[in-house]
Amino acid sequence: MAKLHDKYQETVVAELAKKFGYTSVMQVPRIEKITLNMGVGEAVADKKIMDHAVRDMTAIAGQKPVVTVARKSVAGFKIREGYPIGCKVTLRGERMWEFLERLVDIAIPRIRDFRGLSAKAFDGRGNYAMGVREQIIFPEIDYDKIDKIRGMDIVITTTAKNDEEGRALLDAFNFPFKK
């Protein structure tokens, strides 16, 4: 079992219940899922680009992503309905906790010129969204085997009712927010 999951069950639940005055442990916010999304607009011209993106995402997430396709044709972007334009993966359970651990302990400290995560990226309902500019911050990616530096979106969905609860939950997991 992941260390962060043990920490959540042993200390975080009690801390948050005390801080927000919850009467039941089921009221305490928890992380529901983590969604990774990689938009690969260049895949319209070359199908191999999508294969590389899927390979990278599989290595990072530990499970195979779903290829997302264009819903509408847009002449300005030279895409047609049904063209593959990205990939996404939703992590839950054990894989989610393991990914969160790697994100906080290994990947985030490897971001170039890192000055802390923005605390403004909460959506009003306690969910946190962040962008990563380079997939090479993850140790699973072999720098010599990548064809192009790609970024991705990481969304952490929680059961928190508001941003304050969501921030307290992520703070308990040592997320490095800007002061």
UniProtKB/Swiss-Prot annotation:
Give the matching Pfam families: Ribosomal_L5 (PF00281), Ribosomal_L5_C (PF00673)
Any GO BP annotation: translation
Phosphoprotein is among the record's keywords: no
The yes or no answer to whether the keyword Cell division is present is no
Check the record and name the Gene3D superfamilies matching this protein. Answer: 3.30.1440.10
Entry keyword set = Ribonucleoprotein, Ribosomal protein, RNA-binding, rRNA-binding, tRNA-binding
The terms describing its cellular component in GO are: ribonucleoprotein complex; ribosome
| Gene Ontology molecular function terms on file | rRNA binding; structural constituent of ribosome; tRNA binding
PROSITE patterns found in the cross-reference section: RIBOSOMAL_L5
Q: Which InterPro entries match?
A: Ribosomal_uL5 (IPR002132), Ribosomal_uL5_bac-type (IPR020930), Ribosomal_uL5_C (IPR031309), Ribosomal_uL5_CS (IPR020929), Ribosomal_uL5_dom_sf (IPR022803), Ribosomal_uL5_N (IPR031310)
Q: Which domain of life is it from?
A: Bacteria
Description of how the protein assembles with itself and partners: Part of the 50S ribosomal subunit; part of the 5S rRNA/L5/L18/L25 subcomplex. Contacts the 5S rRNA and the P site tRNA. Forms a bridge to the 30S subunit in the 70S ribosome.
What role is this protein assigned?
A: This is one of the proteins that bind and probably mediate the attachment of the 5S RNA into the large ribosomal subunit, where it forms part of the central protuberance. In the 70S ribosome it contacts protein S13 of the 30S subunit (bridge B1b), connecting the 2 subunits; this bridge is implicated in subunit movement. Contacts the P site tRNA; the 5S rRNA and some of its associated proteins might help stabilize positioning of ribosome-bound tRNAs.
Record's protein name: Large ribosomal subunit protein uL5
What lineage does the source organism belong to?
Bacteria, Pseudomonadati, Pseudomonadota, Gammaproteobacteria, Alteromonadales
